[in-house]
């Protein structure tokens, strides 16, 4: 069988009727507030000193070193992160400078290649132009020579045709064929 709790169970024969708003005064409640009683003041001061001493010891030896180590570790981690960030920034700056340098070099090489290509194409075009010009000059000279020989041949034929026509005209008008020598003299006189 369970034993009753002496703190919550009233003593036998006690009045258990509860009246709301009514506080019953007993001998246990008489006197001053216990912390303010001067009879146990020295014991309270000793316990206060012991409690604060124990609290100070625990704070000094356990809590504060842990907090200090946490703060120190955090400061070290922050310092390491800042150093790493500075190093990464320096690397990024160096990479940016290297990129800019490489870009300028590439642009310079591209300009050089473009200029070289333009020069090569201009030289090739000039060579082709000169070759074509030489070829055209040769064809022109050949054409002029052909025209000259054909003109001379045609003029020779014209003289023959003119001589024949003049001979036919003189023969028709006079009824006699002209002699060849006088006909050649007359043709020579009209040619100059």
Curated annotation (Swiss-Prot):
It comes from the Bacteria. InterPro entries: ATP_synth_b/b'su_bac/chlpt, ATP_synthase_B_chain. F(1)F(0) ATP synthase produces ATP from ADP in the presence of a proton or sodium gradient. F-type ATPases consist of two structural domains, F(1) containing the extramembraneous catalytic core and F(0) containing the membrane proton channel, linked together by a central stalk and a peripheral stalk. During catalysis, ATP synthesis in the catalytic domain of F(1) is coupled via a rotary mechanism of the central stalk subunits to proton translocation. One of its GO terms (cellular component) is proton-transporting ATP synthase complex. It is found in: Cell inner membrane. GO terms for molecular function: proton-transporting ATP synthase activity, rotational mechanism; proton-transporting ATPase activity, rotational mechanism. Belongs to the ATPase B chain family. This is ATP synthase subunit b 2. HAMAP family: ATP_synth_b_bprime (MF_01398). Keywords: ATP synthesis, Cell inner membrane, Cell membrane, CF(0), Hydrogen ion transport, Ion transport, Membrane, Transmembrane, Transmembrane helix, Transport. It is a single-pass membrane protein. F-type ATPases have 2 components, F(1) - the catalytic core - and F(0) - the membrane proton channel. F(1) has five subunits: alpha(3), beta(3), gamma(1), delta(1), epsilon(1). F(0) has three main subunits: a(1), b(2) and c(10-14). The alpha and beta chains form an alternating ring which encloses part of the gamma chain. F(1) is attached to F(0) by a central stalk formed by the gamma and epsilon chains, while a peripheral stalk is formed by the delta and b chains. It comes from Methylobacterium radiotolerans (strain ATCC 27329 / DSM 1819 / JCM 2831 / NBRC 15690 / NCIMB 10815 / 0-1). The chain crosses the membrane at residues 39-59.
